[in-house]
């Protein structure tokens, strides 16, 4: 694949996924988008995506639950959670004690800033996985 990387974007807001797809593809990334976390899980391709961009609050399955299910399929896939809300790490640890994630992106975000965060995550070393 000649792209900068492959990204799976999952957000229940169609305008967000379309804007991310357009902006990321124009910056050289391959992008798949889903507005339904269940459909994203059912169509997930192991060893294909370099990074998941997953909204925290979605109907049917929240972003943390989706990532936990995807991690059962592919432990190497990195994730950045996207949210319009403040993230409270202490409360998050109580609900998902095994979740090891350090990348949270606040919406709205400019595409240039998103690209920088994605590049940093894709190229970061992940010793545990």
Where are these regions (language model features)?
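Active-site residues of response regulator receiver
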Residues: 11, 55
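Two-component/phosphorelay signaling modules centered on CheY-like receiver
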Residues: 14-32, 99
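Acidic, metal-coordinating helix/loop segments flanking the phosphotransfer/catalytic sites
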Residues: 33-51
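Acidic catalytic/metal-coordinating carboxylates
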Residues: 35-36, 62-66
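Short amphipathic alpha-helix used as the core "switch/output" element in two-component signaling
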Residues: 42, 64-75
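Receiver (REC) domain active-site loop signature in two-component systems and cognate sites
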Residues: 58
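Alpha4 helix (beta4-alpha4-beta5 surface) of REC/receiver domains from two-component response regulators
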Residues: 65, 86-103, 112, 116
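Hydrophobic/aromatic residues positioned on beta-strands within the core alpha/beta folds
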Residues: 82-84
